[in-house]
Amino acid sequence: MKEADIHAHIFPEKLAEKASHSIGSFYGVSIEREADMPRLCAEDKLAGITRCVVSNSATNASQVQNANTFLAEAVRGHDGYLAFGTIYPGMDGFEEELDRMLELGLRGIKIHPDFQKLAIDDERGIETYKAIARRDLPVLFHMGDDRYDFSSPERLTNLLRRVPELRAVAAHFGGWRSWPRSLAHLQPEGVLYDT
């Protein structure tokens, strides 16, 4: 049987240790390994994973281009690996960056509202999501951190009412630490979930 992982994070090797530590601190967990491409490939092989989507999330607009270039280069030459790029919703030049992402071969987009400190349904991002939908790119949303109100299931439902053609994937089964809310509110047709 072929196994797939659609939610793996990687960072440039010089940043992987710091990024892994920062993410662990943010969530109050211990991350034992650095999140870089060589380690991911080795561990995927041991686990029998043959397809993998890698991503990371820019925390501000100034990080977007470098992150997308890195992700495209990281998966080049690795059969079975695809990259989802990142965008900061509402950033200047989002149309051009979305086109560049397609030219780079990126296959979707990862949004982390809690790291970006911008609610999924924030008005500033609506035109960005419409542009993403026009390009038929799926968006993997980090979902449901109950410490904040940026990534609630209700907010994704609100966004999909405004941009119903958006292909949304709700990470962490639709609501990291808020699954009951996800089950109650995140019912739009066409939403996919990662588990």
Segments (PLM) and residue ranges:
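An N-terminally biased module of ancient metal coordination in phosphate/nucleic-acid-related enzymes
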Residues: 1-62
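Short, glycine/charged-enriched secondary-structure capping and boundary segments
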Residues: 18-21, 67-69, 97-100, 123-125, ...
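Short beta-strand segments
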Residues: 5, 53-56, 86, 169-171, ...
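A generic "structured core" feature
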Residues: 2-11, 45, 99-101, 128, ...
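Catalytic pocket-lining loop regions of alpha/beta-barrel enzymes
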Residues: 107-108, 121-195
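Alpha-helical scaffolding within the catalytic cores
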Residues: 35-41, 66-71, 93-96, 153-156, ...
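Active-site gating/metal-coordination segments in enzymes
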Residues: 50-51, 59-140, 145-147, 192
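Flexible loop residues that form catalytic
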Residues: 9, 57, 114, 173-174
